[in-house]
């Protein structure tokens, strides 16, 4: 019987491939570059978070950065947008390549190549690794699903306001503003 080689985070880094993530040692293809809708929402969310985080000196906002969530076998995931608090920055191992640690907030945006079922599974992985809050954005249905440890998933519609809870206290974003970014792309 052949022994299967499990890929490590270091091997994935050496490959230099942005189109792969690592799940329990197995390479998983991811879509890159993003389509227009996903790119628009990721840019908008990054801008909103960046402004808030910088104004309050809370930490860092990242776009498509790889996080080594688990070891032996390794799992590396790259959310569309993420936030790492100052406190967590001091405990995460930062060096070239992937961040060895987890984000406080991970944001995933659904698209044809990233279905909600896949993103729900990723949200569970982030939470199991220690992420405090995951937003899964569904542009097609104009909804955002909020995942938190040991809490039921909450679904917000475009008439609701998204907030940063205890991860980004004081941050709010009316979802009508977020989804308005897609209005001129509906054709």
Model-based region annotation:
Residues 1-187:
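Gly/Pro/Ser/Thr-rich low-complexity, intrinsically disordered segments predominantly at protein N-termini
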């Amino acid at each position: 019987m052949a022994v299967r080689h499990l890929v490590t985070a270091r091997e994935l880094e050496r490959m230099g491939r942005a189109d792969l993530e690592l799940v329990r040692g197995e390479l998983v293809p991811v879509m890159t570059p993003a389509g227009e809708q996903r790119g628009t929402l990721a840019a908008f969310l990054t801008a909103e978070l960046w402004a808030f985080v910088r104004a309050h000196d809370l930490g860092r906002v990242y776009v498509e950065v790889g996080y080594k969530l688990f070891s032996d076998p390794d799992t590396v995931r790259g959310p569309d947008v993420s936030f790492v608090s100052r406190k967590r920055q001091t405990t995460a191992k930062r060096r070239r390549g992937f961040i060895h640690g987890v984000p406080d907030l991970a944001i995933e945006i659904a698209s044809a190549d990233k279905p909600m079922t896949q993103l729900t599974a990723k949200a569970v992985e982030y939470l199991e690794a220690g992420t405090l809050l995951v937003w899964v954005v569904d542009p097609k249905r104009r909804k955002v699903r909020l995942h938190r440890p040991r809490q039921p998933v909450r679904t917000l519609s475009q008439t609701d306001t998204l907030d940063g809870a205890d991860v980004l206290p004081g941050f709010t974003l009316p979802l009508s503003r977020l989804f308005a970014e897609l209005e001129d792309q509906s054709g």
